[in-house]
Swiss-Prot record:
Name of the protein described by the UniProt record: N-acetylmuramic acid 6-phosphate etherase
Purpose: Specifically catalyzes the cleavage of the D-lactyl ether substituent of MurNAc 6-phosphate, producing GlcNAc 6-phosphate and D-lactate. Together with AnmK, is also required for the utilization of anhydro-N-acetylmuramic acid (anhMurNAc) either imported from the medium or derived from its own cell wall murein, and thus plays a role in cell wall recycling.
CDD domains referenced in this protein's UniProt entry, alphabetically: SIS_Etherase
Keywords recorded for this protein, A-Z: Carbohydrate metabolism, Lyase
One Pfam family cited in the UniProt record for this chain: GKRP_SIS_N
Protein family: Belongs to the GCKR-like family. MurNAc-6-P etherase subfamily.
Organism the protein comes from: Pectobacterium atrosepticum (strain SCRI 1043 / ATCC BAA-672) (Erwinia carotovora subsp. atroseptica)
Active site per database record: 88 (proton donor), 119
Catalytic activity: N-acetyl-D-muramate 6-phosphate + H2O = N-acetyl-D-glucosamine 6-phosphate + (R)-lactate
GO MF entries: carbohydrate derivative binding; carbon-oxygen lyase activity; ether hydrolase activity
Induction data: Induced by MurNAc 6-phosphate that releases the repressor MurR from the DNA. Repressed by MurR in the absence of MurNAc 6-phosphate.
One GO term of the biological process aspect: amino sugar catabolic process
Amino acid sequence: MNGENLNLGTLVSETRNPATMTLDQLSTLEMMQVFNQEDRKVPEAIAQVLPAIAEAVDLATASLQAGGRLIYLGAGTSGRLGVLDASECPPTFGVPHGLVIGLIAGGPGALLKAVEGAEDDPALGEADLKALSLTATDMVIGLAASGRTPYVIGALRYARDVGCRTAAISCNPHSPIAQEAQVAISPVVGPEALTGSTRLKSGTAQKLVLNMISTGVMVKLGKVYQNLMVDVKATNVKLLDRACRIVVEATGADLDSARQALEQSDNDVKPAILMLLANIGVEAARERLKQHNGYLREALLGG
C-alpha cells in the first residue's frame, strides 16, 4: 500500500492530544497523573459501544454452538492482544486449544519482534485464514487501532466471502475495517497521551473489549455458574486450590468435602459441585451434565 495516500494524520488515534503537549516538562508524578487522567476515558468510550459488543458476543456464541471457532486477527499490539486473550481461554474455561485462536501479522515471531511489512499486505490476512481451513461456521474478529490495517481488511473480506460471522474492533469512527464487518465496535478513546502510540488507550480499549467478548461468550456457553469459572482446568497447584475454593463457594460444603468430591471427579469442578448439591455419585453427575449439554445450572434444576 502506498504510504503517501494513507493520510493517517486525520485519524483520531494519530492526532496530538492538547492535554499532554508538555509531557516532557512534567515531574514524574505529574506525568503519571496525566496518563491516569487519559486512561479514565477508556471505560467511558467502551460504555458507548456496549450494544455492538453484545451483538458480537451473541454472534460468537452462535458460531461456537454450531461447531465453529472464534478467531482474532490483527497486527502489532492489536494482534498480540488477540493472541493473549485466545491463549487464556483454555485454562480459564476448559475449552480445547484451537477453539479460540489469535493470529498476528507476520506469524508467532511477531509477538516478540516487529516483522517489517507484514501488516501492509491484505493477501497475508487471507492466507493466514486459509491456513486454518476457515469455514462458514467460524467467526472472525479483526483488530486494528487505526481501523485501516491492510492485513486485517484482507482477512475480513475473505471471511465474509466464506460466509463467516465477522466483527471489527477499531478506535477510529467509520473505519475501513468497520465497513468490512457485520458488527463494528469502535470505542473512540481520543488522541493518545503520546501522539500515535496506540499501545496506550487504544490498546487498553481493545483488551477490555476482548475480555468482555470472550468472557461473555463463555458465560453463554455454560462455562460459568453464578460468577464462578466452573470449567477451570486444575493443571497446577494454584488452579487446584482455586478449583477447591470454587466448589466450596458454590456448595457451602467444607474444604474436606470439596476436596473429596474433586478427587472422585478427577478434579472436574462441575460434577463435583453437582455431586454435593444433588447428593449423587460422580457417574450420575456426569450423566446429568451430559443430558444438559454441560450447563450446570440446568443440570441442577432439571434433575
